[in-house]
Regions:
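Accessory RNA-recognition modules of RNA-modification enzymes
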Residues: 1-176
């Protein structure tokens, strides 16, 4: 059942960085919405698609990646550093508590950009036989070609180009 243009008040951020609001049948999860925002969303069951931000969170910042919201790798790039760190710390605290562990959590090291040391690049050949390399689009199997990723650690900066070159060599040799 799709409800077009539902007005929602986002209550909190979920574990995957999506905005969460309680609906009549449980939680509704809206990617790219932040806690405290009033949004307009298309709702289908427990999923929402952000259509418009009616009232933005004061914690909202501009995304620093040109692929944000296209590539499926980043969920909370629009959240300012201090609330981002608080959200990440609360995720860790909840996980430890759930496991029955008590531990003091040290402040996070700022890696809200340029800190990712691992990435999975996907590749396939297109209908012309050329390699298409990049990250998967959010909630799909479509590959989004990228030239760079500002979240990668400096030592990983050349990884997209290297992955693309390797995929092209494999495609040229007939490997799939």
């Amino acid at each position: 059942m799709i409800s077009l243009n539902a007005r929602l008040q986002i209550e909190r951020l979920g574990q995957r960085g999506e905005g969460v609001v309680r609906g009549p049948d449980g939680g509704i999860f809206v990617p790219y919405a932040l806690a405290g925002e009033t949004i307009i969303a298309e709702v289908d069951g427990s999923r929402g698609k952000l259509v418009e931000i009616a009232v933005a969170s004061p914690d909202r910042i501009a995304p620093f990646c040109r692929y944000f919201s296209i590539c499926g790798g980043c969920a909370v790039q629009t959240l300012a550093q201090a609330p981002y760190a608080h959200w990440k710390e609360s995720l860790l605290a909840e996980a430890l508590q759930h496991a029955g562990l008590a531990a003091k959590i040290a402040p996070l090291i700022d890696a809200h950009g340029e800190g990712r040391r691992r990435a999975t690049f996907h590749a396939r050949t297109d209908e012309t036989g050329n390699a298409v390399t990049g990250f998967m689009e959010a909630r799909s199997h479509k590959i989004i070609e990228i030239e760079d990723c500002p979240l990668l650690a400096p030592s990983m900066r050349e990884a997209p180009a290297i992955a693309g070159a390797l995929a092209q060599v494999l495609a040229s040799s007939g490997s799939r």
